[in-house]
Amino acid sequence: MTWLVPRYGTFSALTNISLGGDPAVAGNAFGQGSTWFSVLYHGEGTGTRSPVPPGYTGVAVLKFAAFQNGTDGLLDAVSGGLPGWVQAVQYDPESWDFTPPIEKGAWLYNPHPRVSHAELFCRKAHELGLAVVLSPSLDLCNNKPNPAYPGAKPQYPVAPGERNYEAYVRHRLASAARWLRPGDVYEFQSQALETDAARYRSVTAAVEAQVRDLSHGVTFLAGIGRTKANWDGATAAQLTAAARGVAPLVAGYWPNVDENATRVRTMIRFLQDLGY
């Protein structure tokens, strides 16, 4: 099983006994050496600490919300020097201020800037000898004005009656996997669908097919669990049903949980249900 685990968030919450966390369960799940531990870059330069917890082995991932934004994008970090522990870098563009508008609209190749930022990110990372994790958010598909483009038009619009995950599939955002190499990771943020196991599976299957058709040897992961801002009240049983439904399609999961006792206990029970 491959896991993609945020060090300061998911891991710290799941090992916090006061919140109902269980270090033994977390160790059983994430201590097998196949976990990719991540930390979001905030411009700390070479002083950024490795996300791999003491006593664990795994892949150390430095996560970015931008390719370049002048402060804490991948190119900004490279210009200041990457920490020596970095083994992989993650590109996590979302509909938030951390990702520049130009990048939100050019995840795939866009004729206006004449680039794909997913491609630029992968090329730079591979040039540096680093593995890559691509994890574009579903909310890149939206109808918000984008000031970086002519007429402020959204570049991945959602059609009337369509959901953003349907637009994600229609716009083929997962086709960015063409720029990944064997051993890299593509993660689908499927957690928005987790309370409906059938839908979770069908949409994840559509995304996995896009990844498989255009790449070779790429590790495909699915998101599971949500934090306060978007919490859906999912039970451990619902998370387990969703995860088991896509087990033939995925190599593992990106579990999301914040420091909330209800959500922590739910995620621990989910891990126990999976045998940890």
What are the roles of these predicted feature ranges?
Residues 1-276:
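Glycan-processing catalytic domains of CAZymes
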